């Protein structure tokens, strides 16, 4: 299982306020960071992997404690052995980036009640969870461009020599677990900031899960590009391995 986290700072606008129920719409901007096999060993180095995240949201509040939210977000995940402090992982020399689209349906519970018209106590704290579907597509940079890794079967997925390794799907499910804070700027506008890990059910966010595929067999079934990108360990002179005819 791999995890990614979203840090969102957003503006919320309330187009309709009723006595007990109301709707809100919002636009979010923030950052995303990945945690997995290609994460750095030093925690502080994770900041080097933060990438932009954007989202739009619509929520229905049943009362000042409970709401449901539908959101769509787009963000990038990235990992790189080059920033790892462990020499054996630098030697491994793997990296990836992935553009991710997520749609999520979540329930929200407000620990501090949320009332956008309550200006004397404008802060609300909430927790949220639900289910998210996302589409990812890990790619690696090689020979001047980015290449999608899933079709290359870099760990032998789908090859005759690895019948137990099935190709992973690019559409996946995640469980968000969110802690957030809202601040009422006015009765119709609020700001919020939230921290939201997503727990996934795939080990291939980064195209890395198990062991290297056997090079010659991979080359025969998937070609030279797959052969090069499956094993990028650095040679003694500091250059990545390259396999050519």
What residue spans do the PLM features occupy?
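Glycine- and aromatic-enriched membrane insertion/assembly motifs of diderm outer-membrane
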Residues: 46-98
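Predominantly the C-terminal beta-signal and adjacent terminal strand-loop region
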Residues: 186-245
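Transmembrane beta-strands of outer-membrane beta-barrel pores
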Residues: 29-35, 72-78, 111, 131-137, ...
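Extracellular loop and loop/strand-boundary signature of outer-membrane beta-barrel proteins
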Residues: 37-44, 88-96, 114, 161-167
